[in-house]
């Protein structure tokens, strides 16, 4: 009524641009609340087993856990395994060893919902904003959510959730991580000469792998050429049901929406795979010495650290899969675009660092302090002629408050 009375609405057709009274009355009985239809309670499960123990010479622990969860909407499930184990050994009075191993494996399966390259995270918003007078199917055919104009104003109107739930399209992600930490410690406390010297050798390694697969196909939606109601805005019977069954549901009254096939992702459908792997380790050797000789205190440290890392990734894309495709690489329809149906890329990188650290500290009666420090670092991130950098330093201190005359 407001628009009809607005003199600036010169192109307004009150019959077809506005809902009519018979349509408004019919809509009171319509409630295609898709969010309520598809929303479900998500179930989460978590199970774990723990083991631990100790003797005079060793202590140990182990844990394995399993977690699974499904989603509130659609086909979604996630599962993850975690494990941890460790042992500490007292090999001799002076020698100790430790080892810890941990890791996880996760897998997520979900329905691909990238209609016309929209975000796959928009399913909630699409269901929430779906007009509640528009059904998902009419006469056994999936319908585009065209509103009052019966035309496509936005690609999101091609989002038919029921159809998507019945496709084989998917997105799958897998992650796998393994971590190892080991160490040896030796104490020279038994030696009169080397007392105060401690050696430590530590090693850590991390391996991570990810893999993601996606498959999207194309599908067809329909629109009604002639709709129901005096303004032709509805999809359900208004008045004469015989007319609805004979005319509205006739095959000739259905036209393809969007002007052609609708893609779930890339035009024509696609198969996408990506894999990454990273492998790195760190090795440390440290020698610490600290000892007092009367009023003289001496401490020293020497350390070597070496790291190496490697990373690689592979990406592949294939378009125009067959309708019966199950995501395998041999299920592309090469008759459509020939050799242009596939593309791939890959990358690989390596890096490493090496560091030496030396430090000597001397203190007399906690009054006079002296420190010598030198550090040398090398990194493959720099040009070969600039691999190494050297950083020496000398510092001294005077504890004035320790002087006898200061207290007086």
Name each region found by the language model.
Residues 7-28, 118-158, 218-263, 310-343:
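Surface-exposed loop/turn segments flanking beta-strands in extracellular/periplasmic regions
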Residues 209, 329-393:
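Signature of Gram-negative outer-membrane beta-barrel scaffolds
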